[in-house]
C-alpha cells in the first residue's frame, strides 16, 4: 500500500506510534501531491490493485479538503483505486464521503489509551461507520481483560458485528510486539475475530 498521512489528531493516546509525524508536516496542493504520486509510479500500481491508505492522526479533521482531493483524484486517474480511510471514530463522516465507496479502517480507542471515555466513545458515529459495506474495527489490546470492554461497549449494544473486529497488540518496540502478540492472537482465536500484527515494528523496530 501507499500511505498519505494527514497532520493533526483529536486524541493523544499513550501508545500512539505516529505522534512525531502528525504533530509536524508540510502543506501540499493537489498538483504537488499528483507529482509525488507520478514520480513514485503509483498510478499503474493503483490500476493493478495496490491500496492507497489515507491516515493520520485524524483524516476526518480535514474532511472538506479530503473530499475535494478524492473527487479530483478520481477524475485525474480515470480509475477507482482501492482507497482506505483510517480514523479514530470521533468525527462523523459526511454522506458525500460515505458514498465514495471507500474502505473504512476504524480504530476505536479503549480505556487502555488513557483517552477520556466522553471523547473516545461515540456510539452514533461508530454505528454509522459499522453500517458502511467495507468497514472494519481495529482495537489495540494490552491485556486479555480489554476484550470485556469490547464486548460490553461494542458488541452487546450491537454497534458493530463480530466479523468486523480486528485485534492488534499494543507495542512500540519489536520486543513488546513479540511479547504481546501470542496473548492477543490467542484472544482473537478464542473470540472468533481477526488478528493483525504491526509489521513495520516487527521488521524495522521503529514506530514510523
Q: Residue locations for each model-derived region?
A:
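Conserved AdoMet/S-adenosylmethionine-binding subsite of the radical SAM
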Residues: 60-208
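Conserved Radical SAM active-site core
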Residues: 1-103
Amino acid at each position: 500500500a501507499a500511505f498519505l498521512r494527514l497532520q493533526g489528531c483529536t486524541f493523544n493516546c499513550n501508545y500512539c506510534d505516529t505522534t512525531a509525524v502528525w504533530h509536524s508536516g508540510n502543506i501540499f496542493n493537489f498538483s504537488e501531491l499528483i507529482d509525488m504520486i507520478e514520480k513514485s509510479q503509483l498510478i499503474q500500481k493503483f490500476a493493478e490493485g495496490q491500496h492507497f491508505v489515507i491516515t493520520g492522526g485524524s483524516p476526518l479533521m480535514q474532511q472538506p479538503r479530503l473530499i475535494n482531493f478524492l473527487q479530483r483524484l478520481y477524475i485525474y486517474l480515470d480509475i477507482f483505486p482501492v482507497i482506505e480511510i483510517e480514523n479514530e471514530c470521533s468525527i462523523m463522516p459526511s454522506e458525500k464521503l460515505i458514498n465514495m465507496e471507500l474502505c473504512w479502517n476504524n480504530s476505536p480507542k479503549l480505556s487502555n489509551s488513557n483517552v477520556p471515555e466522553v471523547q473516545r466513545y461515540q456510539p452514533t458515529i461508530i454505528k454509522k461507520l459499522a453500517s458502511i459495506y467495507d468497514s472494519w474495527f481495529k482495537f489495540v489490546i494490552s491485556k486479555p481483560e480489554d476484550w470485556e470492554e469490547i464486548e460490553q461497549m461494542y458488541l452487546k449494544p450491537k454497534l458493530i458485528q463480530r466479523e468486523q473486529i480486528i485485534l492488534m497488540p499494543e507495542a512500540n518496540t519489536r520486543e513488546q510486539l513479540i511479547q504481546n502478540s501470542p496473548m492477543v492472537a490467542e484472544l482473537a482465536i478464542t473470540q472468533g475475530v481477526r488478528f493483525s500484527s504491526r509489521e513495520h515494528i516487527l521488521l524495522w523496530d521503529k514506530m514510523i
